[in-house]
């Protein structure tokens, strides 16, 4: 009977801890970020919709690298790209993570509200391009991602994107919306190559 009580106590403690963990996880708006980054910053390997990634923390910055298939990264960055997260609250509450990377003439930003690519100082339309990938775009003076989704979900949405949505300001100071099909959308790197070729 004594052994049975010990066993039941262990079971109760397990469920109590599990429930407490769930409460903590749910309280963070970006709970799924734990699937991508280790809280202690040590390197972590995984995949998002079949696209492999490695994440780590270096010099206080969280870094996420996504890889094109089985390719080994090269110095020119043709088969991988990075998101360097330059701000986060702490190891346990990373819901305010904002990541950014710059390649060529455009910046890649990853925040708690969504995923955007912003390109500045481009000649077309005389304005600044705000580019985003979504099924139901909303074009405003500043692009707004309408869904507050988890990091893993909008990364997956970006990887599976079928077309590029963008807006720009024309000569009459009016925002014009447009779109462009993305080929070979199953790979993140093809999206970036399309962007690089397009501009």
What does each model-identified segment do?
Residues 1-28:
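Classical Sec-dependent N-terminal signal peptides that target proteins to the secretory pathway
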């Amino acid at each position: 009977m004594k052994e049975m009580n010990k066993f039941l106590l262990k079971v109760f403690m397990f469920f109590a801890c599990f429930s407490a963990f769930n409460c903590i996880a749910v309280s963070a708006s970006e709970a799924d970020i734990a699937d991508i980054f280790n809280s202690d910053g040590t390197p972590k390997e995984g995949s998002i919709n079949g696209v492999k990634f490695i994440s780590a923390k270096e010099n206080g910055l969280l870094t996420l690298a996504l890889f094109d298939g089985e390719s080994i990264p090269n110095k020119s960055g043709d088969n991988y790209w990075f998101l360097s997260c330059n701000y986060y609250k702490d190891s346990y509450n990373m819901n305010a993570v904002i990541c950014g990377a710059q390649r060529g003439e455009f910046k890649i930003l990853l925040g708690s509200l969504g995923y955007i690519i912003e390109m500045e100082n481009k000649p077309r339309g005389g304005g600044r391009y705000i580019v985003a990938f979504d099924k139901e775009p909303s074009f405003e003076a500043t692009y707004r991602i309408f869904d507050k989704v988890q990091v893993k979900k909008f990364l997956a949405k970006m990887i599976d994107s079928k077309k590029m949505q963008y807006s720009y300001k024309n000569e009459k100071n009016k925002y014009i919306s447009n779109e462009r099909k993305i080929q070979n959308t199953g790979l993140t790197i093809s999206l970036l190559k399309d962007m690089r070729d397009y501009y």
